[in-house]
Amino acid sequence: MKYFCDLHIHSKYSRGTSKNITIENLSKYAKIKGLHILGTGDFTHPEWFSQLKEKLEEKEEKGVYYLKKQDTQNKLLNYCDTQTTEEETRETGFIFQTEISLMYSDAVKSRKIHIVILSPNIPVTEEINKYFSSKGRMDY
């Protein structure tokens, strides 16, 4: 099976993003756009990570998380059409993902390197967050 994924997104806690971003809305619009799996975005942000842990659960696929409540997925089906295909009834998967920015200055100007980090599960994500929290602020 082919998967269409977007593994580099941001949460509502990032600069320049919609304040309407929720995990439910991400799932809804991923389905409309034909995406199977999304990155969670910004798992290093404490409030967002707390919401992710509350609302997502790992199922049979290791490392892929889904909304705990099937009701949210079913509401979208009513939005689409009364005759739905198997593709329309599938759940949106999520992989824990964040981006970090490494900044430095050379003799001429400042530079940034952006790194996307994917994490296989909640315990590893918690370890990553613990490490980064020892290096600086995590709430922005």
Where in the sequence are the language-model features?
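Short Gly/charged-rich anion-binding patches and loops
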Residues: 25
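Histidine/acidic-residue-rich catalytic or RNA/ligand-binding cores of hydrolases
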Residues: 15-18, 49-53
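Domain-core and long-helix interface of multi-subunit machines
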Residues: 1-22, 131-140
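Divalent metal-dependent hydrolysis catalytic cores, especially in the metallo-beta-lactamase
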Residues: 28-49
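Extended substrate/RNA-proximal surfaces in nucleic-acid metabolism proteins
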Residues: 2, 50-140
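Active-site neighborhood of phospho(di)ester-bond hydrolases with catalytic His/Asp-centered motifs
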Residues: 6-7, 38-42, 95-97
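Catalytic metal-binding/acid-base residues of hydrolase active sites
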Residues: 10, 44, 99-101
